[in-house]
Amino acid sequence: MAGRERVSDHGEVSMSKHAAVESDEHVAERTAEAARQVERLTRWHDDFPTPGVRFADLTPVFADAEGFRSVIESLAACAPDADLVAGVDARGFLLGAGVAATLGTGVLAVRKGGKLPPPVISREYSLEYGSAALEIPGNGVELRGRRVLLLDDVLATGGTLAAAAHLFVEAGAQVVAAAVVLELEFLGGRARQGDYPLTSILRLP
């Protein structure tokens, strides 16, 4: 994509806001193509990881060159002016790295509890099949004032994404947008999110 580059306060080189923003029509086309790839490649598993849960396996999407490229391009268009991309443990790491490379920003892994050395910023949350915690570094990475694009693979009950967003707010950052590959609308996860824009490539009622 052609455009004028700028250097942020945190050293990332990215495109100027006006040059980087694609037309709404182009973004819609990217999202529609990515949605087709996700629908075609996703595998479904009943009663996994616990009885009554239907698990969406996006591994084939990530392993397919065309599918992965479509997903990354679609997610990157959600917040072209972000200066940090954050991916939620674990498949969000794959998304975060790809989108950060596309936007020319850094990437931060939002880890599950107990995976980072102290100090950490931590938040507990509930899953559709249990509970867990998420963490980000409490020092070593300057987060105050950062413009964060937050990524995860699936939006189900919404607890994971909401907890991740809370971590960055607590650290003094701004979540400028959040995006997921697949949204299970019947679980109502969107209602648990903050006032940041939330994009889903494929939404299943």
Language-model features: where?
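PRPP-associated nucleotide enzymes
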Residues: M1-P205
